[in-house]
UniProtKB/Swiss-Prot annotation:
Transmembrane segments: none annotated. Belongs to the universal ribosomal protein uL1 family. This is Large ribosomal subunit protein uL1. Keywords: Repressor, Ribonucleoprotein, Ribosomal protein, RNA-binding, rRNA-binding, Translation regulation, tRNA-binding. GO terms for molecular function: rRNA binding; structural constituent of ribosome; tRNA binding.
Amino acid sequence: MKHGKNYKNALAKYDSAASYELPKAVDIVKELKYAKFDETVEVHVSLTLGKGQSVRDTLVLPHQFRGEKKVLVFCTDDRVKEALDAGAAYAGSTEYIEKVKGGWLDFDIAVATPDMMKDVGRLGMVLGRRGLMPNPKTGTVTTDIASAINELKKGRVEFRADKGGVVHLPVGKVSMDSSKIVENVQALINETMRKKPADAKGDYIRSVSISSTMGPGVWVDYKVGE
């Protein structure tokens, strides 16, 4: 992959082979910013996963950095008021299933009660490819609608390892206070360790790096449990 002049200039400003303590790594990422927009800071956690092992879960980052999410709740008519009172942007059953089937996607997150999943599951071609399908593992298939909406609006995010065993997660904006980005990164590292498969072998976390949208990656000398 070819990189432009700005990227190469940023790369020359630090030792790209060195690992830095997390606060310093965050400061470097912010110093290397060169885009005119408020770049997103992303963390990349490389894991040692054996055959058949996977990591997928959710966490509420200590510091939210994105606008409020529009939540759609698939539920029976008798629970619509409960969902809307809890902060859902939309709630209902057949009406919204048909709207989504027709291509309507004016929401950021979908939640469903278990009794709705038989019908919601048929929306896989629309919701699945966009990562919007409700799933029990991410807490978006639940009978406790109010709690789910509350956590989602607080900034609960899903994280999962890709086929290469790497978890990628946005953790802030370069305009944020560095300490808030540090706390968000540390929260992911700690939660990833808590979800370590019981039969995982060797060094579970192989490496951690952070970068901004346009900038180069910075290796992190990470610590667990701080």
